[in-house]
């Protein structure tokens, strides 16, 4: 399903989906509000394709949230899923969705994008943590 979106804008689309997941989890903003993307203040605005791919990622993650959370939780070593910081949790959820349900996207691409987002938005250790958990998921997916 994701092949209908050009690959060039996918990084931007993943960041938008990550931000929507974070806002949904941290502030309880409804998916309906978030998928309208009226909260964006970007110039230039994202393309229609970027917004479409972001919606696909965000809503797909929410649709499979129970399975995704179980998968991520089972791959954590010395961590409790409910105690993860919300940035790392949003990145892991989004990327686990892609690893589990978007088989046309190579795992190395998913992990690379997640690590990049973790470097930009997470703590100093987030990118290593995200890389390790997602690598573990990719090996068993």
UniProtKB/Swiss-Prot annotation:
Keywords for the protein's UniProt record, in alphabetical order: RNA-binding, Transcription, Transcription antitermination, Transcription regulation
A GO molecular function held by the record: RNA binding
SUPFAM superfamilies named among the record's database cross-references: NusB-like
GO biological process, one term: DNA-templated transcription termination
Superkingdom of the organism of origin: Bacteria
Pfam families assigned: NusB
A cellular-component GO term for this protein: cytosol
InterPro entries: NusB-like_sf, NusB_fam, NusB_RsmB_TIM44
The keyword RNA-binding appears for this protein: yes
Coiled coil: none
Function: Involved in transcription antitermination. Required for transcription of ribosomal RNA (rRNA) genes. Binds specifically to the boxA antiterminator sequence of the ribosomal RNA (rrn) operons.
Family of this protein: Belongs to the NusB family.
Name of protein: Transcription antitermination protein NusB
Gene designation: nusB
